[in-house]
Regions:
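Hydrophobic alpha-helical segments, chiefly the membrane-spanning helices
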Residues: 1-319
Length: 319
């Protein structure tokens, strides 16, 4: 029973730990006169992906790589179909030109790249299905290309990064926040992974299934709440771009760094999940083509949500 309580508490620790670490590091950055633009692109962007990253690294070193891979792929499907679906039902979501013509195609390319590298044995590159250290470095290379693009776009929209956006605290308090954040991330990640393994064994489910569903939804909850609240406030200008950017971070940064630290065994059953990400990303493009305007309408959001429910049913059937 305790392990399931810690499993739930682990998600809280992960999310709050990332928040504390970002607040502390951002405060120190402001004290050192680092620009709000750089803080937003580095500390905040990387900090918000820390829960998924810690889960992946801990799962990998605990010999449960299926949890990590499932978490990344499941989060990407949930980001598009669940988060954008619910948000669009609340309020139609505009898609910016950069998101439509650059970021969504880049996300599709990243998904195809992960699929190609993971299935390298089919092409005679190796004898086993694994995302190797070299593959991880390739993913990181493309990630830093994407980061360069984000930097260029952000400089053009520099006015969006307010100097007052990040709270400045005393240095001791900032350090305490960072230490507490690191502790929360570590113990939260540990409890989530341990709980997932125990749950999989008890209910006779695969670790991959747990990663694709419960952990993926759990680590996506902050984005879901933020996007839903923004939709209620009609503040949805960059909602789609944020989700697509998060998917690129997951595929290139989290999988890339995790594989560089320790090669990740890959189960070919994940190919159907990669296909689902490709289909979801393609649906984003079709939403504009079918609707004849750059927006995800309410009925398209409903379609996304139904597709996600169907995907969960498919995963339950697959086991």
């Amino acid at each position: 029973m305790l392990v399931y309580v810690l499993f739930v508490v682990g998600f809280v620790f992960l999310i709050k730990g990332a928040d504390l670490m970002v607040e502390g590091a951002s405060s120190i950055g402001k004290r050192l006169n680092v620009s709000s633009l750089i803080i937003g692109l580095t500390i905040v962007s990387f900090g918000t992906s820390l829960p998924e990253l810690l889960v992946n690294i801990i799962a990998s070193y605990n010999d449960s790589p299926d949890i990590g891979v499932g978490n990344v792929l499941g989060s990407n499907v949930a980001n598009i179909l669940l988060i954008l679906g619910i948000s669009a039902i609340i309020s139609p979501l505009p898609i910016t030109k950069n998101t439509y013509f650059i970021e969504v195609p880049f996300s599709l390319t990243a998904t195809l790249l992960v699929g190609f590298l993971a299935n390298a044995s089919i092409f005679g590159r190796s004898t086993e299905f694994v995302i190797s250290r070299n593959d991880g470095l390739v993913l990181l290379f493309f990630f830093f290309l994407f980061l360069g693009y984000v930097y260029i776009v952000s400089k053009q929209r520099k006015s969006e990064f307010s100097a007052d956006e990040y709270k400045v605290m005393s240095m001791p308090r900032s350090i305490v926040y960072i230490v507490l954040g690191i502790a929360g991330l570590y113990f939260g990640g540990l409890w989530v992974v341990d709980g997932a393994v125990t749950m999989a064994r008890f209910f006779n489910m695969s670790e991959h299934f747990i990663g694709l569903t419960i952990i993926a939804i759990g680590t996506s909850l902050p984005e879901l709440v933020t996007s839903a609240v923004a939709a209620f406030k009609r503040d949805t200008d960059i909602a789609v771009g944020n989700v697509v950017g998060s998917n690129i971070f997951n595929l290139l940064w989290i999988l890339g760094l995790s594989a560089t630290l320790k090669p990740i065994p890959y189960d070919v059953i994940s190919n159907s999940d990669i296909f689902m990400i490709i289909a979801s990303s393609t649906a984003l493009i079709l939403a504009v083509v079918v609707g004849k305007r750059p927006v995800i309408s309410r009925w398209e959001g409903f379609f996304f949500l139904v597709a996600y429910i169907w995907y969960i049913a498919f995963l339950i059937e697959r086991g």
